[in-house]
């Protein structure tokens, strides 16, 4: 047997030792390999439940909502330096905005998407109001106002002079439900403008969808003001229900309105 001297490396393993080392390494690889192959597989059972949810998955879950049934553009009349009708400290622009926000609330509770032409006491051009509704591709346009006349009282709803059946139905549904809540006088559904039956209010003329303009009583009539203050939530619900009733009648559930108003001459 050869002896090892100074400067000569001693073998680390004998033949038997190398065989044992290789055998141990083989079993180690067998133990690790199944786990290494699972990195790209979906976890199941308890493993799946213990997996952390990624930020992307959380965001997708949070934003996954039921699609809106349809879209309504609510237009609170006047605003900013245009107060509309004024009686004492009471401004038409304030009453209109309060009502629009309430109607919005009740419509959204019924999964209806709502767009407001203004959300605060701000002046908005009539052309911008119409543009807001058209760009939103709204199914309906509802403008909210108040009247002024020392001899007048009651609630009325207007459509365009060249109104469509759907616009008229929308006006009728809203007017009927408000009257049921309680008004001093039912002034009915009217077509055109106060000045001319052959003309139309700008916002109704320039919007491409069925639309109405509501006059919520006379601001200079004490009884009308009392009724509005007492029943404002009920009026808002009546308007919202009238809108939904009309949409369901003409389009059913899940359909997008394809009806556009006929352009005015």
List where the protein language model places each region.
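N-terminal Lys/Arg-rich, disordered targeting/topogenic segments
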Residues: 1-16, 24
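Hydrophobic membrane-insertion alpha-helices, especially the h-region
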Residues: 18-35
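Sec-dependent signal peptide cleavage junction
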Residues: 32-50, 55, 254
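Active-site histidine-acidic residue metal-binding/catalytic motifs
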Residues: 49-130
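Active-site microenvironments of hydrolase-like enzyme catalytic domains
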Residues: 73-86, 120-178, 194-220
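Stable alpha-helical elements in mature extracytoplasmic
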Residues: 92-95, 99, 103, 126-132, ...
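Sec-exported extracytoplasmic/periplasmic mature domains
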Residues: 101-112, 134-138, 146, 175-183, ...
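Active-site-adjacent mobile loop/cap segments within catalytic or ligand-binding domains
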Residues: 136, 141-144, 192-265
